Amino acid sequence: MDARSLLLLWLLLPLLLLLGCEVQGAHLTQQDEPTSPDLLETLSTYWDSAKAAAQGLYNNTYLPAVDETIRDIYSKGSAAISTYTGILTDQILTMLQGKQ
């Protein structure tokens, strides 16, 4: 395995474990009454207005120069992390193999 696949595995494994776990709380009695359609409609309306507000805020504050800077920082940072992950992997494998 190369360093990139090890890093990807290291980052995705906890996420997959978290998503695969089922959260169990105290057992509550289930209600037999169906949820009110008016309540669902109200929640849907609130959700749509929140999405529209967030999209509007994003569109108003978007700066191409900042976006390019963030992309550049991300690419340089991920390259550095890949390098140091490879070094760390080599060190761990050397320690596990021992002197031959």
Curated annotation (Swiss-Prot):
Protein name: Apolipoprotein C-II
Tissue expression per record: Liver.
One GO BP: high-density lipoprotein particle clearance
Protein family (similarity comment): Belongs to the apolipoprotein C2 family.
Signal peptide: 1-25
Species for this entry: Cavia porcellus
Function according to Swiss-Prot or TrEMBL: Component of chylomicrons, very low-density lipoproteins (VLDL), low-density lipoproteins (LDL), and high-density lipoproteins (HDL) in plasma. Plays an important role in lipoprotein metabolism as an activator of lipoprotein lipase. Both proapolipoprotein C-II and apolipoprotein C-II can activate lipoprotein lipase.
Molecular function per GO: lipase inhibitor activity; lipid binding; lipoprotein lipase activator activity; phospholipase activator activity; phospholipase binding
KW Signal (keyword) present: yes
Compartments where located: Secreted
